């Protein structure tokens, strides 16, 4: 398993639809890059100049929206994860 450092989080991206509403199957190049996912791991938080640590605002299990081209994709087995800085998370999706 991956453990993020500092103010980073690990996100499992939500799958995009494979077809349009009218039934057209999308190719990989035609799909929009997903910017939603579920947080699966959270780092310890950002360290300030005075040495104190700011706790993360997000938690494991939160569904979030993040910046379109943020982070680094990492493959582990069959799964692909995204490691992003907490600042790149735009919102928590509340159900």
UniProtKB/Swiss-Prot annotation:
Q: Which PROSITE patterns match?
A: CHAPERONINS_CPN10 (PS00681)
Sorted alphabetically, which InterPro entries does this protein's record hold?
A: Chaperonin_GroES, Chaperonin_GroES_sf, Chaprnonin_Cpn10_CS, GroES-like_sf
Q: One GO cellular component from the entry?
A: cytoplasm
Record keyword Nucleus present: no
Major localisation: cytoplasm
- Any idea which UniProt keywords this protein has? Chaperone, Cytoplasm
Family the UniProt entry places it in: Belongs to the GroES chaperonin family.
**Quaternary structure (record):** Heptamer of 7 subunits arranged in a ring. Interacts with the chaperonin GroEL.
Q: What is this protein called?
A: Co-chaperonin GroES
Q: Which organism does this record belong to?
A: Staphylococcus saprophyticus subsp. saprophyticus (strain ATCC 15305 / DSM 20229 / NCIMB 8711 / NCTC 7292 / S-41)
């Amino acid at each position: 398993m991956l453990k993020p450092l500092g103010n980073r989080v690990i996100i499992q991206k939500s799958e995009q639809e494979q077809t349009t509403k009218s039934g057209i199957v999308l190719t990989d190049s035609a799909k929009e890059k997903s910017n939603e996912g579920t947080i699966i791991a959270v780092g310890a938080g950002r360290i300030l100049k005075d040495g104190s640590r700011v706790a993360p605002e997000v938690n494991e299990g939160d569904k979030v929206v993040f910046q379109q081209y943020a982070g680094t994709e990492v493959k582990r087995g069959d799964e692909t994860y995204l490691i992003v800085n907490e600042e790149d998370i735009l919102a928590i999706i509340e159900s």
